[in-house]
């Protein structure tokens, strides 16, 4: 039997990229899915997935809209079993060029939107003593990079609130976990649509040696949404091809062929 048969899920940021892949995999596994997104493309995506998918226009920073969507999904389907907080925005700016408004905007969507989503569905899931919330953080929420002051901060916040929510909701039968993707070929990280082969040529510095397709991350969300992960609470599931596992010293055994900046070459005696 499919792993999500009979479950009702809400997936935010589902118009394209990882969110669309998550929604599609959920339906393939038997779920009924409400796709939400601020982009109008969400309608087309839901239609392409099929009759088990419904689209909602949704700004995740709008608390009233959250209540409307959750109430409508419950009215139509009787419950919400799974919430995936996937909506997010990416901004490449360093500390000196990031304005307070820049920081607030990224934090509002990525962190506050996730908080509002959890807060909205939690009473319903607590009442049923059942539910799974999966928050999309990032490998940058564990090991950040330069020029991501706002983005990494927001993803660290998602990571932290996931832990707190897991502690508070776990005794009520509600599981809360986070996924930490990295190097996924989505429109957010590859807005110019560069060919996969071109992207892969720059990936010799971590174990996978390539970017991932969105479905590879989506499969991790299926696991955490399903009963297969029944004992996972506050789990951080990293899906990054080994991006933050460590680093290679090129020129020493165990490293793949490739060229990196001097900081990643073997230390000299």
Role assignments for model-derived ranges:
Residues 3-34:
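Canonical Rossmann dinucleotide-binding motif of NAD(H)/NADP(H)-dependent dehydrogenases/reductases
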Residues 178, 197-232, 239-241, 266-269:
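C-terminal helical subdomain
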């Amino acid at each position: 039997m499919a792993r999500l048969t009979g479950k009702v899920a809400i997936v935010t940021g589902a118009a394209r990229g990882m969110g669309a892949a998550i929604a599609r995999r959920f339906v393939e596994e038997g779920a009924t899915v409400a796709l939400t997104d601020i982009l109008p493309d969400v309608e087309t995506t839901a239609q392409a997935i099929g009759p088990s998918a419904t689209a909602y226009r949704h700004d995740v920073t709008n608390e009233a809209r959250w209540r409307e969507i959750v109430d409508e999904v419950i009215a139509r389907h009787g419950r919400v079993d799974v919430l995936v907080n996937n909506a997010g925005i990416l901004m490449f700016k360093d500390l000196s060029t990031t304005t307070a408004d820049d920081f607030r905007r990224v934090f509002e969507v990525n962190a506050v939107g996730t908080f509002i989503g959890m807060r909205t569905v939690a009473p319903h899931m607590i009442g049923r003593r059942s539910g799974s919330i999966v928050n999309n953080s990032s490998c940058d929420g564990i090991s950040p990079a330069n020029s991501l002051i706002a983005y990494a901060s927001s993803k660290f916040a998602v990571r932290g609130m996931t832990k707190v929510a897991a502690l508070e909701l776990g005794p009520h039968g509600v599981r809360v976990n986070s996924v930490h993707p990295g190097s996924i070929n989505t429109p957010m990280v590859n807005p110019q649509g560069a060919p996969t082969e071109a992207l892969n040529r720059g990936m010799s510095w971590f174990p996978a040696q390539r970017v991932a397709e969105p479905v590879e991350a989506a499969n991790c969300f299926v696991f955490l949404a399903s009963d297969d992960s029944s004992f996972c609470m506050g789990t951080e599931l990293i899906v990054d091809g080994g991006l933050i596992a460590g680093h290679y010293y090129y020129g020493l055994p165990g490293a793949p062929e490739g060229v990196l900046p001097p900081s990643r070459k073997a230390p000299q005696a």
